[in-house]
Amino acid sequence: MIPKLHQYQIDNNVTAFSTMRSCDENSLQAEGKVSDAYASFNINPWVGDNEEQVNSNRLELAKALEINEKNIILPHQTHQTEVRQIASEFLSLPSSVQSMLLEGVDALITNEPNVCIGVSTADCVPVIMYDAEHKAIAVAHAGWRGTVENIMRKTVEKMYRSFNTDPKTLQVVIGPSISFESFEVGSDVFNAFNEKGLATDKQCVCSSAQLPSTNNSNVLVDNSAKDNEPKWHIDLAQCNKKQLESLGVPAQNITLSGICTYSNHHKYFSARRLGTASGRIYTGIILRG
């Protein structure tokens, strides 16, 4: 199956994208896959998908990107803040050793050309970074845990140490993720944000009662009246944007996709909508040689 890619126009020297499920829900219906939580394009091997299909999808993606399939790099993410540099030495290692080095990694950086570094998401925030001055790229997976632990800082600092990247020159894209309105959480998640001082900005965190009214039927319903537990909404994309700005990345250099995975689950995988046994969006970037 030829992958459908949502491409980001950052610079002529890079290719940046997020994979999509399908053109629309009707095409999934026509293919008989509307109930298939892995349809129509998943390359993540850790979510229960058919191994043969995953491998086939990787090959198709490599073909579409015009790179070697072995140069599609995908870490096994664990909602932490480990950042791994993909250097030329890494590319020459046996696949078993590469897999070991990618275990528990949630962000990648490289300055190697024609290597696609990417992360998997299905509501969490994928973030792409490009340093044109030093010809270096990065990609990070920021779920709520990674956001609380500021994976943006860890990634930018790693780029600085490895490539002398100046945050003021970074170009950043924040890809599809669950929206402020749809990401409802309990007190445990709110408290984690509050302890880090991230709950004071109402643009990023607010109670369900404070959420602006919306006619969107895809927005999660406030259950606080049912279980007497307060409910909160968090804008993960906005939180990560503000963290990047605090590191010196200019606001005008940060592009938000504005795509809610929960509301657009027929085009982008959403674990909240489809369950965790479902496909994942692959958001990647390639430095063209």
Predicted feature residues:
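Active-site microenvironment for binding and transforming phosphate-containing groups
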Residues: M1-G289
